């Protein structure tokens, strides 16, 4: 049965992957990728930040499987270049672009005090992945200073001085829409383990790009910044008691040396752990900055059926959390427990990275079973699913990171999978 679903999914993804590509239109001067097929209820016309990055991971696998290297390069590179075209002088990059405009909530630019979220830190990662695949950085070389401004904007305007951790400005367009560690929380109060894991890899990716063009001093500087961030994550986000990484609460009142109250013993901590069991707690394994001992403890947590381990993958929120909720929703999409292709894939990649092949195989097979059953029954895939019975919950026709099961299938069959940076 599993082999039949593998073949079914391979054929479907290889045939339909080109439906995620779009030609230049309006303000988008370059070809680009979108999350859904034409005509899908959502996401069929817009270029999104981490969605386009994940689409490129899939398209690399399609090109490898069909022996057509570079087939989608113009769309993948164009996605990066479109974002760079719309980067302002301060390095602020939009989260989303359409031919007619972009998704905004408040002003993320200097005029707004850099107080809104911007493109997630996957821009250098996207470029580094495509550069490695192409064997040349010539396509991105002129834009490297722009990527540098983008990263510097994160470091200058989105990082907490006391901890060295990146934080969400608001809960707007954070990717994991209603993650309770950020959703409806005060502005600039959450040092997200998800955001910091992405930023750690972003700094490493930019270092790789700089090395590729021969700028070794700056490459070393960016890698040192990545190491500093990893130290901050291990210091402030790791919980030795629970054996996992959590996001941190930064919303502490400042110490006032002029106020006599508490002067004898003011607080000496810079943050408090937000002990909310969320799938993104496993992202430090994907990022490769967890120690071997930390990874082993997290592996045990990923195996626990009371919390994360479900019949069809990793619950996006532990079943023991009071916020656990499997109802269908859009704006926000629901990350309060449903299984997503993206979370299954990134947890799988973390398990592979630390040599936990049996656990990785089990998660990959669950994902094949989830998507194979849906494709066989409905002729399409959906955005997210019930973790225990595998029933689709929302958005028929969603493609994007669901197609990452193709990369899992390659790994299951002992082929070298296409991977992210």
PLM regions and their residue ranges:
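Catalytic cores of carbohydrate-active enzymes
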Residues: 3-8, 20-25, 94, 156-167, ...
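Carbohydrate-binding/catalytic loop surfaces
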Residues: 25-45, 94-118, 163-188, 242-280, ...
């Amino acid at each position: 049965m599993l082999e039949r679903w593998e073949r079914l999914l391979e054929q479907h993804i290889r045939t339909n992957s080109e439906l995620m590509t779009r030609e230049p239109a309006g303000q988008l001067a370059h070809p680009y990728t979108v999350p859904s097929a034409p005509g899908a209820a959502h996401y069929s016309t817009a270029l999104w930040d981490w969605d386009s990055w994940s689409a490129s991971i899939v398209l690399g696998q399609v090109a490898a499987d069909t022996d057509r290297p570079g087939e989608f390069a113009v769309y993948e590179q164009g996605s990066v270049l479109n974002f760079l075209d719309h980067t302002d002088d301060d390095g602020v990059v939009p989260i989303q672009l359409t031919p007619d405009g972009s998704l905004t909530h408040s002003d993320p630019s200097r005029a707004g005090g850099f107080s809104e979220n911007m493109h997630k830190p996957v821009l250098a990662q996207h470029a580094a992945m495509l550069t490695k695949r192409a064997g040349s950085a010539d396509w991105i070389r002129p834009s490297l200073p722009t990527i540098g401004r983008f990263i510097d904007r994160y470091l200058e305007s989105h990082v907490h001085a006391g901890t060295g951790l990146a934080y969400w400005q608001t809960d707007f367009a954070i990717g994991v829409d209603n993650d309770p560690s950020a959703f409806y929380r005060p502005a600039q109060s959450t040092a997200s383990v998800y955001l910091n894991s992405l930023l750690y890899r972003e700094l490493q990716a930019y270092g790789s790009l700089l090395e590729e063009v021969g700028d070794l001093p700056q490459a070393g500087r960016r890698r040192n910044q990545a190491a500093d961030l990893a130290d901050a994550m291990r210091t402030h986000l790791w919980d030795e008691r629970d054996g996992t990484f959590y996001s941190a609460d930064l919303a502490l009142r400042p110490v006032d040396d002029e106020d006599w109250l508490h002067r004898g013993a003011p607080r000496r901590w810079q943050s408090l752990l937000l002990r909310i069991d969320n799938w993104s707690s496993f992202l430090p394994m994907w990022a490769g900055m967890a120690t071997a001992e930390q990874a082993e403890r997290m592996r045990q947590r990923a195996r626990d059926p009371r919390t994360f381990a479900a019949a069809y993958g990793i619950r996006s929120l532990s079943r023991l959390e009071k916020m656990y909720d499997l109802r269908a929703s859009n704006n926000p999409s629901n990350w309060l427990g449903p299984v997503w292709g993206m979370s299954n894939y990134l947890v799988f990649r973390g398990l592979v990275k630390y040599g936990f092949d049996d656990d990785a195989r089990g998660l990959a097979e669950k994902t094949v079973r989830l998507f194979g059953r849906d494709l066989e029954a409905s002729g399409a895939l959906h955005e997210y699913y019930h973790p225990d019975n595998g029933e689709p919950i929302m958005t028929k026709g969603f493609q994007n990171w669901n197609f990452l099961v193709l990369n899992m299938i390659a790994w299951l069959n002992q082929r070298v999978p296409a991977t992210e940076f």
